[in-house]
Curated annotation (Swiss-Prot):
It is an enzyme of class 6 (ligase). One of its GO terms (molecular function) is asparagine-tRNA ligase activity. InterPro entries: Aa-tRNA-synt_II, aa-tRNA-synth_II, aa-tRNA-synth_II/BPL/LPL, Asn-tRNA-ligase, Asp/Asn-tRNA-synth_IIb, NA-bd_OB-fold, NA-bd_OB_tRNA. This is Asparagine--tRNA ligase. One of its GO terms (cellular component) is cytoplasm.
Length: 440
């Protein structure tokens, strides 16, 4: 006999009036004399299963009474439409098979502190809100990859262990690599994906990245996931157009397919509904002026001298002036990575942009036109105190058929936090890695 259910909660509407078997976990149970209401979740949704004592065997009713929170079971019964029921359907129970009992489940309806919940993250992901956030995360990832594939991009996987640093070694996790010296956990796949771009024209990589930043803010993780497209023969303007189309498509897909999850999270989607190209654009210079003009509106967003990078409060202040994501472009080259193309009309700034999400979620994308001149790139590598020999292969990309090209990296967790309205990024990844957390 197969253990597989004959239906799922997500497909239950097809089976009204029919007998089905569901398999899942007890999310909640209420007993009212001869009636027992079991809220069963199976990963695709939840449904109320009604056990009426006179309609089932004594054994089945006793099993229903014994069920505890998160017990796993198979329930067979008839599907009935009922607009009063959660989800609009109920299952009239005929039989229950207990598969795995659950004893004193630690996460109860009472309030638990964040530290307790994070220590039990392996169980917390079963809760309705965490489930909704992670379901939307999966949708964001699927939407991103499918959209890029439809646009002719090729997925190009890049290594996690690298011999060189893409943006300096300060924030890298290092490990010994046999007899070859140090290896680093990748902080980006960008340098390698540029090699793929020279082969395929339009590529992207997707995977985990690592930053050894001793940061405890609500926007930072030490391990997070990025998707990084790269396009040959594309300039800075092309790059921003690609980003706004990309982000708009992802948001539209989530609004279309994960509306129920957004409702579970009580997410106000008013601003999300307005996400469509073109996005507003301001320069770094204009952003500096905006910050000075609105001093005191956001705590910590103090005026900055030209040449300083923005902190989280500054990003929050800037984004608060727009109802959609906003590009801040042409940052000082000194605060950006060595590979960014200088503006030919103003070399002290780079042809780059950060895309800031509204509602205080900050930077979700960083991108730039890349330096394609080998002499200038070598000069920038030296200026950043990096060893030329570590980047010979990267310089080769400019020596053999160089072309102008651009790309960007989008942080999955920050996008998910913004779309779901989640205040802390730790809830947007199944098992967050933070400064003081590596368990479970």
């Amino acid at each position: 006999m197969s253990l597989l259910p004959t239906a799922t909660v997500a497909t239950i509407a097809r089976y009204v009036g029919q007998r089905v078997t569901l398999a899942g976990w007890v999310y909640h149970k209420t007993e009212k004399g001869k009636l027992i209401f079991i809220l069963l979740r199976d990963g695709s949704g939840t449904i109320q299963c009604v056990t009426f004592k006179k309609n089932v065997s004594e054994e089945t009713f006793a099993t229903a009474q014994s069920l505890t929170q998160e017990s796993s079971c198979r329930i067979t019964g008839s599907v009935r439409a009922d607009e009063r029921a959660p989800g609009g359907y109920e299952l009239d129970v005929e039989s229950i098979e207990l598969i795995g009992p659950s004893h004193e489940y630690p996460i109860t309806p009472k309030e638990h502190g964040v530290e307790f919940l994070m220590a039990h993250r392996h169980l917390w992901v079963r809760s309705a809100k965490q489930h909704a956030i992670l379901r939307i995360r999966a949708e964001v990832i699927a939407a991103a990859q499918e959209w890029l594939n439809e646009q002719g991009f090729v997925r190009f996987d890049t290594p996690i262990l690298t011999a060189t640093a893409a943006e300096g070694t300060t924030n890298l996790f290092a490990t010994d690599y046999f007899d070859l010296g140090k290896a680093y956990l990748a902080q980006t796949g960008q340098l390698y994906v540029e090699a793929g771009m020279m082969a395929f024209g339009k590529v992207y990589c997707f995977g985990p990245t690592f930053r050894a930043e001793k940061s405890k803010t609500r926007r930072h993780l030490t391990e997070f996931w990025m998707i990084e497209p790269e396009v040959a023969f594309a300039d800075h303007e092309d790059n921003m157009r690609l980003q706004e189309e990309f982000v708009s498509a992802i948001v539209a897909r989530v609004l279309e397919r994960r509306r129920d999850d957004l409702q579970t999270l009580e997410r106000d989607t008013t601003l999300l509904e307005q996400v469509r190209p073109p996005f507003p654009r301001i320069t770094y210079d204009e952003a500096i002026e905006l910050i000075a003009a609105h001093q005191g509106e956001v705590e910590g967003a103090d005026p900055l001298p030209w040449g300083e990078d923005f902190g989280a409060p500054h990003e929050t202040l800037i984004a608060s002036k727009f109802d959609r994501p906003v590009f801040v472009e042409r940052f000082p080259s000194a605060v950006k990575a060595f590979y960014m193309q200088p503006d030919p009309e103003r070399p002290e700034v780079a042809l780059c942009a950060d895309l800031l999400a509204p509602e205080g979620y900050g930077e979700i994308i960083g991108g730039s036109q890349r330096i394609h001149d080998p002499i200038l790139l070598e000069q920038r590598i030296r200026e950043h105190g990096l060893r030329i020999e570590d980047y010979e292969w990267y310089l080769d990309l400019r020596r053999y058929g160089t072309v102008p090209h651009s790309g960007f990296g989008m942080g999955i967790e920050r996008v998910v936090a913004w779309i779901t309205g989640t205040r802390h990024i730790r809830e947007t990844i199944p098992f967050p890695r933070q400064l003081y957390r590596i368990y479970p």
